[in-house]
Amino acid sequence: TAAIVNSTAEMIAGENLIISDEDDRDLEARVKLQNFMDRANGNESLHEVLKKVAFDFKLQGAFALNIVWSKDRTQIAEIYHVDVSKVRCARPDELGKTPGYYISADWTNTRQNKPYYVPAFNTNDRTSPNQIMYAGLYSPNMNSYYSADWVSCANWALIDSRISEYHL
């Protein structure tokens, strides 16, 4: 199953990101976009971030991004991948919207790894310089968290694995 998840994530991410619009009327915007794609954050290109997002999405049915606004809050300055297993949803508001997320390096030991709150991504409220975009596959009755599309066949995969071990 690991090979299936890895190869599917690679197919989701694709080979690279390219700008297909050849219209050079707004060359400055195109150069700015290409620079952002080449360096989405201090260490990675946007495609490298996308590969991590694709892996989380296929493995866990969800992904999380840390969106960093520019100092004047007019545009997105950086995008970082956040390991979705480190993210927990805050209590939803009266409309069912999650106002933010808690992040911890290790949820089994929150005394040493104190969770910290980060507001949810919102283009209308840019007061926080960092915001978390958390998204996944829609599933009925799953309001805050998501499940992977392969979960329904997990028991069959386990049975196949046990049968192959039995016949050794």
Over which residues does each language-model region extend?
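Structured, contiguous alpha/beta core segments that scaffold functional sites
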Residues: 1-168
